[in-house]
Amino acid sequence: MDVNQAKQEHLLALKVMRLTKPTLFTNMPVTCEDRDLPGDLFLRLMKDDPSTVKGAETLILGEMLTLPQNFGNIFLGETFSSYISVHNDSSQVVKDILVKADLQTSSQRLNLSASNSAVSELKPECCIDDVIHHEVKEIGTHILVCAVSYTTQTGEKLYFRKFFKFQVLKPLDVKTKFYNAETDEVFLEAQIQNITTSPMFMEKVSLEPSMMYNVTELNNVASGDESSESTFGKMSYLQPLDTRQYLYCLKPKPEFAEKAGVIKGVTVIGKLDIVWKTNLGERGRLQTSQLQRMAPGYGDVRLSLEFIPDTVDLEEPFDITCKITNCSERTMDLLLEMCNTRSVHWCGVSGRQLGKLSPSASLSIPLKLLSSVQGLQSISGLRLTDTFLKRTYEYDDIAQVCVVCPYTSPES
């Protein structure tokens, strides 16, 4: 913390101290064998030390608390607390004392004073005390500006300021990845790394979705008594430089799921709300900005699967259900064609009319196929033609099925 001292001697003295949690006292135990030259000297010294734990003198952590010896670090999301004291060091009464505390950041100036009214008088050896609090929401350089104005007994008005500069650091490194599913679901993977020098207790990591989505947290596992437990265990500590991954599933709300054009254009997913605790329960909170994803491009016509079996029998027909959605802003007149591949064959009439499909409307079509080759086979060969514009849309590698032989050949 940098302090610019006032050049002129004043009747009042200003002191500013940061309020932080104390820390547990640590010592470095020194031991030796009984047959060594010091004998039991080190053990007796540790037992006489008031800072050690009785019965566990070799434990590094002691029972006593120590106050911080320096300004320490301030991290984004924590609460900055400071004690401000104005003391009358003179032998005369000072009048109309006004103490003002402002916090200057890179983007704004905030008034942190609890009261903006002046104190009528301050007698010798008396003081004015104030405690300020501020939740830090910006990183970078912060300057605490403390200004004091007063009037002497002779009626002279005096004024002085002190500046306290400190840096706000970033506590967490948050990285996100999006995965778009064919069912309009969006999976969010959030990687959170502790980039401080002390462990954190992760109290809450939640996703606040946008108005179009419902969210499901995938960070719990079901236990036997119908309750769920966190995948990270009961004591959710994040050590320095450790990274933890959180997973969320977002589903469109029913009123928006039917509007293909609306879901297609959505880029805002929501924001992460992270709450943690550090030394002796000191809390910090961080909210990310609105998370955005690259909206998937489906073109004018989207083809998705509503039903498909995982495993089918060799040379036995099986059914699938396709959903065709008009993602354009015009009405389409669609024609469906089915092209066979080497291993998968379509059953039915190719080149049939599907009729007109309005913008954002959907149509479900049941289809039948047959596979002539075993193994994992890809379903391809669907063609949709818009007869209005004479434009054809090709769909290959729509899905995969596992083809097995239902017959068991006798052993030779």
Curated annotation (Swiss-Prot):
Which GO cellular component does the record give, naming just one?
TRAPPIII protein complex
Cited Pfam families: TRAPPC13_C, TRAPPC13_M, TRAPPC13_N
Q: Which InterPro entries match?
A: TRAPPC13 (IPR010378), TRAPPC13_C (IPR055428), TRAPPC13_M (IPR055429), TRAPPC13_N (IPR055427)
**Superkingdom of the organism of origin:** Eukaryota
Question: Subunit info?
Answer: Part of the multisubunit TRAPP (transport protein particle) complex.
Q: Which family does it belong to?
A: Belongs to the TRAPPC13 family.
Protein name in the entry: Trafficking protein particle complex subunit 13
Protein source organism:
Danio rerio
Which gene codes for it? trappc13
